[in-house]
């Protein structure tokens, strides 16, 4: 019987505080396999990059790839943070210096309809004893955000039959590297028993000892580098898979060295320093945010309206995590204030639907004020206050006014907000009744920075 080890990481999201221990663990396992003349594979399942971290922001993810090169992964795929959190040009060059293969079967250039040059749909690795392991990868499809970024993202169910059929006959063990989420993984397992192993990610689910669906082994290792997946495949002399032993190893149990903390802090310091070199504007007054102080929010609402070329904007105060003080403004200050990978959306609604949307917002206002938001691009703590520019709501008469005038139910109105408002479940009118246009490639912090630059030039 041959033993093949497969180690997998996923959804690190630039949580580099766990990286020294993860690297040490992976290196140790690879050394052990080499000494025992065993085959070992290492893969990453995407969302290794997340621009909340200043070093990731400052290098457009290139620093993350440098870290991945320390491992020498056999294969990686991308998550939505690489795919949508990068401009098309940034993603096209993210892996220029990578020493590993990027696998991805459902992303194509929107203009040429060809696969990106930095990716391939699959890879076959032959073990020391001749077992052929086929790896292929799929990432979560978000057409609303991939398309305006220049990509044609396709749904896995449309591609899986051909991908599975083309690979199954060539390999002994078939492995799907999935950045699709637990629900999709289970559906795929139920439909494609030809797949032997699905390595899961995206929804941050954790299988300490795996899960079996329709004879397909599922594995998943949580989020933020809190676990590393460790799988041992047992194959017979005919290279048939007989058993898969799955476990998730807690990073907290891994060896920690005294110098680890200095390395972790070094990543932050390097990121801050690089961002501080990039000056944006020279502002004459503080842009604060807090109780009764809305100057930073007002400046951002103005910037949003300028970028979208509209007269009305809506945003929430929980986005603003730090003030921007008077004097020279750099990209580090913008990033600390607005670390979220959020884009703007331009929304058009009939007047009747706009009134309903504002009523939804007012109904949820007190609930959302201190409501903790997790995910969907949000990197803060609570949602906060809903802030309008150009809209007014009369709480006594429940009337909504647009630029001081009553709203006409049959007329069309266009405003700008952040895409987060569309993704969270509190304002369904935006998605159900609205015509939404995503404004790429800038994040909200870049929109604010561009506005400050235009209004407050550096002498």
Task: State where each predicted segment sits.
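Residues in well-ordered beta-strands of folded domains
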Residues: 103, 219, 315, 392, ...
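C-terminal extensions
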Residues: 191-194, 198-205, 309, 314-353
């Amino acid at each position: 019987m041959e033993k093949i080890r497969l180690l997998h990481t996923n959804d690190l999201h630039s949580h580099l505080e766990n990286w020294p221990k993860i690297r040490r663990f992976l290196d140790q396992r690879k050394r052990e396999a080499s000494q025992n003349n065993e085959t070992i594979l290492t893969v990453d399942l995407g969302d290794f990059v997340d621009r909340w971290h200043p070093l990731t922001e400052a290098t457009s993810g290139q620093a993350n790839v440098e870290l991945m090169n320390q491992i020498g992964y056999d294969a990686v795929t991308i998550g939505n943070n690489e795919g949508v959190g990068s401009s098309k040009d940034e993603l096209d060059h993210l892996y220029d210096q990578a020493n590993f293969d990027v696998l991805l079967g459902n992303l194509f250039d929107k203009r040429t309809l060809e696969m990106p040059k930095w990716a391939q749909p699959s890879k076959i690795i032959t073990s020391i004893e001749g077992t052929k392991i086929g790896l292929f990868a799929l990432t979560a499809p978000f057409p609303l955000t991939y398309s305006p970024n220049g990509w044609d993202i396709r749904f896995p169910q449309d591609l899986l039959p051909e991908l599975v059929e083309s690979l199954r006959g060539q390999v002994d063990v078939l492995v799907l590297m999935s950045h699709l989420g637990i629900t999709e993984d289970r559906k795929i397992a139920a439909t494609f028993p030809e797949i032997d192993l699905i390595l899961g990610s995206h929804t941050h689910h954790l299988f300490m000892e795996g899960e079996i669906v329709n004879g397909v082994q599922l594995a998943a290792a949580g989020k933020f580098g809190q676990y590393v997946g460790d799988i041992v495949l047992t194959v017979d002399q005919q290279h048939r898979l007989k058993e898969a032993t799955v476990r998730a190893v807690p990073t907290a149990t891994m060896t920690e060295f005294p110098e680890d903390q200095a390395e972790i802090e070094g990543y932050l310091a390097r990121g801050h320093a690089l961002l501080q070199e990039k000056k944006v504007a020279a502002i004459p007054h503080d842009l604060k945010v807090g109780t009764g102080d809305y100057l930073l929010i007002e400046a951002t609402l103005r910037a949003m309206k300028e970028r979208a070329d509209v007269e009305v904007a809506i945003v929430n105060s929980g986005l603003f995590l730090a003030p921007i003080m008077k004097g020279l403004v750099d990209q580090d200050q913008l990033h600390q204030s607005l670390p979220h990978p959020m884009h703007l959306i331009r929304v058009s609604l009939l007047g009747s639907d706009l009134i309903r949307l504002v009523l939804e917002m007012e109904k949820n206002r007190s609930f959302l004020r201190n409501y903790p938001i997790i995910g969907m691009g949000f990197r803060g703590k609570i949602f906060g206050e809903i802030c309008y520019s150009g809209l007014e709501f009369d709480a006594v008469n429940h009337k909504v006014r647009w630029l001081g005038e009553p709203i006409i139910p049959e007329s069309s109105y266009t405003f700008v907000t952040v895409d987060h408002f569309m993704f969270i479940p509190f304002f369904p009118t935006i998605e159900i009744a609205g015509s939404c246009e995503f404004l790429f490639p800038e994040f909200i912090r870049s929109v604010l920075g561009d506005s400050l630059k235009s209004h407050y030039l550096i002498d």
